[in-house]
A protein has these predicted regions:
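A short, amphipathic edge element
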Residues: 1-11
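Nudix hydrolase/Nudix homology domain
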Residues: 1-2, 68, 79, 112, ...
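Conserved Nudix-box catalytic region and its N-terminal flanking loop in Nudix hydrolases
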Residues: 2, 45-89, 137
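Acidic, metal-coordinating catalytic segment for phosphate/diphosphate chemistry
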Residues: 9-45, 51
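Short glycine/serine/proline-enriched coil/turn segments at secondary-structure junctions
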Residues: 16, 64, 110-113
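Active-site-adjacent beta-strand/loop module that shapes the phosphate/pyrophosphate-binding cleft
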Residues: 22-29, 111-130, 144
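Short loop segments at secondary-structure junctions
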Residues: 29, 50-52, 61, 124-128, ...
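A contiguous pocket-lining binding segment that forms or flanks enzyme active sites
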Residues: 82-124, 133, 137
Length: 162
């Protein structure tokens, strides 16, 4: 199979907010198509290592799916913010810790319809903050100290779905 060319025609913004929604028009193999695209700032995800065998996870309510989810601390990169700056901020906001950040990888989360690129970091040598940063008003976050082997099991048993 070859990489045939896609020819961009137009994009129309249909919602312009912190997250944008647009409709793209393009041609492929002589046919015209339209696709809905969510424009989302890049984001960060942090794996906070408490020790060699233990990490911090969080449990927080996610409105879009109407449930609490167990996940790694994460959040969007604000305008003019570098990925490691966002990771430092999110780690402090969501866990009350600071640490040494090491870049791990990055990946698109849902590239069939969303532009969000998540940068992953490992945080080591964690220190509890004396005056933790306040969470966003709509956040209710519970921190969980979890054995690394249990966190891996959570990925397989459905405890971690985000």
């Amino acid at each position: 199979m070859s990489e045939d060319s896609y020819n961009f025609i137009d994009k129309k913004i249909i919602h312009d907010g912190p997250v944008k929604l647009r409709i793209d028009s393009f041609t492929y193999r002589g046919k015209t198509f339209k696709k809905e695209v969510v424009e989302h700032n890049p984001s960060v995800g942090i794996i906070p290592r408490i020790s060699e065998n233990e990490i911090l996870l969080i449990k927080q309510f996610r409105h879009a799916v109407n449930r609490y989810l167990v996940e790694i601390p994460a959040g969007k990169i604000e305008n003019n913010e570098l990925p490691h700056e966002a990771a430092k901020r999110e780690l402090a906001e969501e866990t009350g810790y600071m640490g040494i950040l090491q870049p791990l990888t990055k990946c698109f989360l849902a590239p069939s319809y969303d532009t969000e690129l998540m940068h992953f970091f490992v945080a080591r040598d964690l220190t509890k903050l004396d005056n933790p940063t306040k969470m966003d008003e709509d956040e209710n976050i519970i921190t969980m100290n979890v054995k690394l082997k249990d966190a891996i099991s959570y990925c397989y048993d459905g405890t971690i779905t985000d």
